[in-house]
Amino acid sequence: VGLPRSGSTLIEQILASHSAVEGTMELPEIISMTRGLRRQASPGPNATYYDVLATLDADAVRALGEQYIERTRIQRKTPAPYFIDKMPNNFVHVGLIHLALPNARIIDARRHPLACCFSCYKQHFARGQNFTYSLEDVGHYYADYVALMAHFDEVLPGRVHRVIYERMVEDTEAEVRRLLDYCGLPFEEGCMRFFENDRPVRTASSEQVRQPIFRDALDHW
């Protein structure tokens, strides 16, 4: 989870270079799940899916997780036991993910606010991400994202693993080892050679992840 242009594609490419992990890119199932819950809410402009989620018992919440696993099965192409859902905007739904998928590993990809916001602003996204069309809007959005993730850090301590892009660039192996340890995976040298992985990548960073990590993007703002 995180904002666009924050290093999430790099993280996915590193993890997808592990023998136990399949990269399945950005999946729509969590957002579809929230829309389904929202349709069950009482009519009104202020109704949210959170209102419905709060009324569900343990069995109903477990069923949501099972539904997610079943619906994402079509995206699986390899027998790897783990897969990645790289939808950045799922940071809004960390609470739902925590409840419905208690065994999921939640990774927050974070980048320096000026670097992230400027990169978002100058990137023409294929669709969505309307908040990136104004520097003021993207700045407010970044601040809201940081505040929400701080809330989850407080109420769910240790549940979310944060990968700071700048630290990944400065000390790649140490950060990769921390990431794999959080995921319960042994270190594999292939994760350090992620740029040799020829899996399809369909984000704005598709060219960068075909190269070794470089420092050029650290302070370009």
What are these regions (language model features)?
Residues 97-101, 107-128, 132:
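Conserved P-loop NTPase nucleotide-binding/switch module
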Residues 45-80, 120-162, 170-221:
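PAPS-dependent sulfotransferases, especially Golgi type II membrane carbohydrate sulfotransferases
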Residues 31-33, 116, 197:
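Generic structural signal for helix capping and beta-alpha/helix-loop junctions
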Residues 7-22, 93-102, 109-112, 162-189, ...:
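PAPS/PAP-binding and catalytic site of the sulfotransferase fold
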